[in-house]
């Protein structure tokens, strides 16, 4: 998994390690604003049984060819299979889960692939401690480890990072998705939040350049320039960069901390003209000894082993939710959960008990008498509990697990706002089709 010395020398690095990477050809990010990304004009199923076909058009309505959109049922049937993270043209981690009640060993690997690679959708959970063996087994949703694909990883001392490489196809596809949904619901306020990872925000730009990486801030700005001007684009890169010396990302895991999510929430509210509660209004809960996805993927490096993360959660007065379980039944749960007894690899699940296809939160005392739909990946788990303090009705869809129809949900619930919250490594061509499928 560790790169050969000649590849390491190619990057011009000393004393660092790169995992699961291949020599990358840097794709330049276009300067200035690009032309608006094409939209998908959705069609009903054809009479000959070929479902899910869409015509690809420019925003002004001119035909620009056709693109296939996966049949929604087929997409959902693949939940036990794979999940893609292609925006960074990173490599993929493949894990084969062996089910056993007593123990199971994880076989991990990675392939260097381009934008359209398929990753893994995680349905098991990590069970381990700093000394123990990594085990993956089926578990309740309360113990699931939320995770996106881990691509090329870079280890520098006590911190690990996931490398980012720009892909024109990936960001344009994501912009097309947002433009399509805006066209479908012209009266709904639509927002896009592309969340940078720790590599783009924390790591020295000079080191990024040595790794032949692309400018993440430029990539996000370019993606936003391709979106319909009605879409509210939220610049969280600058907001997070202003706090880069604070604990806004985990060092052993690919997620942000809830402190990072709070700064992003502040920026979202600012873009919408809303006020936010200070952190002093929340109850602070600390859960030490957290080892995240980077730690396990890198086979427990000593530099990370001796410096575990701490999960800090901010619990507001609204702390209840309803979520669908694996059988589609609506269950009661908490937005912030006590994680001290969770296994070291599971403690990010203190936020919303991990990933669920559908969540409802109702807060009659909220200052905003509005309803919002959040379409998210696992970065949203730390974000939604903050949002829930301020909105009367919050509906959350995780496109990787959702079994319903988001278009029907918007109409039935009278949803007024939609927020797409996706981390930078979780956007791309096929993922955009998968997100679009939940609206059909």
Outline where the language-model segments fall.
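Extracellular glycan-modifying ectodomains
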Residues: 1-440
């Amino acid at each position: 998994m560790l790169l050969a010395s000649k590849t390491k020398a190619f990057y011009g690095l000393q004393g660092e390690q790169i995992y699961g990477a291949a020599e990358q050809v840097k794709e330049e990010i276009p300067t200035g604003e690009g032309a608006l990304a094409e939209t998908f004009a959705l069609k009903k199923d054809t009479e000959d049984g070929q479902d899910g076909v869409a015509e690809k058009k420019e925003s002004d309505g001119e035909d620009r060819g056709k693109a296939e959109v996966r049949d929604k049922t087929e997409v959902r049937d693949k939940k036990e299979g794979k999940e893609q993270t292609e925006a960074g043209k990173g490599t993929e981690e493949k894990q084969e889960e062996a089910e056993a009640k007593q123990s199971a060993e994880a076989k991990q690997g990675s392939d260097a692939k381009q934008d359209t690679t398929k990753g893994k959708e995680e349905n098991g959970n990590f069970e381990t401690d700093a000394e123990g063996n990594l085990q993956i087994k089926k578990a309740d949703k309360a113990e699931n480890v939320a995770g996106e694909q881990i691509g090329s990883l870079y280890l520098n001392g006590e911190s690990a990072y996931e490398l980012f490489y720009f892909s024109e196809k990936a960001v344009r596809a994501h912009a097309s998705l947002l433009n399509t949904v805006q066209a479908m619901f012209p009266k709904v306020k639509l927002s896009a939040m592309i969340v940078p990872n720790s590599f783009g925000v924390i790591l020295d730009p000079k080191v990024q350049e040595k790794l032949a990486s692309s400018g993440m801030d430029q990539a996000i700005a370019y993606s936003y320039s391709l979106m319909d001007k009605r879409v509210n684009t939220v610049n969280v890169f600058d907001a997070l960069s202003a706090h880069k010396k604070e604990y806004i990302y985990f060092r052993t895991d690919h997620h942000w901390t809830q402190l990072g999510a709070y700064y992003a929430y502040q920026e979202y509210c600012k873009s919408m003209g809303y006020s936010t509660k200070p952190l002093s209004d929340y109850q602070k809960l600390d859960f030490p000894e957290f080892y995240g996805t980077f730690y396990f993927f890198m086979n427990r490096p000593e530099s990370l082993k001796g410096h575990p993360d701490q999960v800090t959660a901010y619990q507001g007065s609204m702390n209840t939710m309803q979520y669908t379980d694996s059988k589609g039944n609506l269950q009661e749960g908490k937005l912030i959960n006590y994680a001290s007894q969770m296994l070291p690899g599971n403690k990010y699940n203190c936020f919303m008990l991990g990933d669920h296809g559908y969540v409802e939160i109702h807060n009659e005392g909220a200052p905003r008498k509005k309803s919002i739909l959040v379409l998210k990946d696992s970065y949203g788990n730390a974000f939604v509990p903050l949002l829930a303090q301020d909105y009367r009705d919050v509906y959350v869809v995780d496109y990787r697990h959702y079994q319903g129809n988001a278009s029907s949900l918007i109409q039935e619930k009278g949803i007024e706002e939609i927020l797409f919250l996706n981390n930078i490594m979780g956007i791309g061509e096929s993922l955009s089709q998968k997100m679009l499928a939940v609206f059909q």
